[in-house]
């Protein structure tokens, strides 16, 4: 089956931009996000594969408890950068043999979808900055989930994603799971993009207390292709025109009158054996939307 879902865990500044590299963010914030990632990866949606930047080794102690095959790394700074000093904090990388190494997230994604490994559903988690996450949005198609911490500061070097994090949709408390919760009402209404603010309960474990520099932690299901079609609040949908730049406009169809259809045949509903009848959905079939929202409303996501 390969990769059925991708979740990106990262940090954004007040401009909704990602840091260029991991060392641009406080290590304690990465430690907090790695613990969040470890807890959330217990969702029953495929085998969790958590790939991270190698320079987050010191702040990923909780992820090191996963099986070695489930916690690969990517050396975003090359094979020679074993330790980096940033503001007095040393960002150690994994030593040779400690973790499985991927050349990039894209190569690992292709490996999980190949026939070289066991045919199982995989949930790929990506923990890191733009040097690790940018290819996920640029080169891997399809919608992706995001769990990102928003801080009030501004990164000196950053990358602005093609979509706007948390701008088009209001934030919703993520920990509320009542039957009339807005997320469930949205899912029932057929919406396929939701954004929720991950709430922090007073009775939460001390290991999940967020650092004071974090304004909020946002959960989002992002489809960059769909977000480009949705206008900002208060703006109408843009009218589609023939593409410019040498492309020919589509041919006009002939205005010849179409043959009249029998009103009786059109009004008659299709029978089950009729080829016009829609294919009946089997009880075990799961749509991609139900699979995508499974992790939102599943019992293990109500932490």
Swiss-Prot record:
Composition bias type Low complexity, residue spans: 256-268
Annotated region described as Disordered, given as residue ranges: 230-284
Assigned protein family: Belongs to the herpesviridae US2 family.
Name of the protein in question: US1 protein
Species of the source: Equine herpesvirus 1 (strain Kentucky A) (EHV-1)
